[in-house]
Amino acid sequence: MKRILLTNDDGYESKGLIKLAKMLKKHFKAEITIVAPANEKSACSHSITLTKPLRFQKVKKRFYKLEDGTPADCVYLALHALYKNHLPDLIISGINKGANVGEDITYSGTCAGAMEAVLHGIPAIALSQFYQDDQKELNFKLALNITKKIVKKVFKKGFPLDKKEFLNINFPSSKTNFKGIKICKAGKRIYSYEAHSNINPRGIEYYWLAAANLDHEDEKKSDITLLKQGYATITPIMLNLTAYKQMKNLKKWMKNG
């Protein structure tokens, strides 16, 4: 029997996570385990908790929430505490509420769950559902259908990437016409950084950091452009962050002057 571990950054009650688990249980003869943050941890990136102990709270059979835990914590701790004899065959993080494209990947707790998985040598997929601001309810039907096909391929043909690489999959808004699936590169986001100040009843100033809209550089074959056109995008992500093209330039820069 295959073993699948699920996590996310929207929290253990997230609809995307619950619907994903139900779909996997229905279509795969697999042991499904969920370990997710007790609270929303969006944009927590790849942080892990080293300054205080962590505690599982059992929601039901093979379903746990982690108090104050990040997605990376959830994966890390699950592998050490729940999988002592047999590690999972696949780890899936999501389905996230909102896209994770371009440089969003570096902020994303959803993608960090997949990153933590591949650091432990386990194949991983990050799933994110793009939506438009005026959408009241997210429709995960397309995301679930595509995920089912991808998981079937993984179990039949093996994971298509090397070690320390994961699949980052984004699904288009249900308000756009679905055009198909594209394998593509991560695009380049344009952020409108904002910090809104206010004064609390005690006269102390505080700030809210504002989330940016999905603005981006115009690249025809990037995940951002294709996603907004109605494509589901699949991007292979590697953890090696070395800018190899700059190695020679950096050596010259260090020698000169």
Curated annotation (Swiss-Prot):
Primary location group: cytoplasm
Top EC class of this enzyme: hydrolase
Catalyzed reactions per annotation: a ribonucleoside 5'-phosphate + H2O = a ribonucleoside + phosphate
Keyword presence, Metal-binding: yes
InterPro entries, per the entry: SurE, SurE-like_Pase/nucleotidase, SurE-like_sf
Keyword field contains Transferase: no
Gene3D superfamilies: Survival protein SurE-like phosphatase/nucleotidase
Task performed by this protein: Nucleotidase that shows phosphatase activity on nucleoside 5'-monophosphates.
Similarity comment text for this entry: Belongs to the SurE nucleotidase family.
Record-given protein name: 5'-nucleotidase SurE
Taxonomic lineage of the native organism: Bacteria, Pseudomonadati, Campylobacterota, Epsilonproteobacteria, Campylobacterales
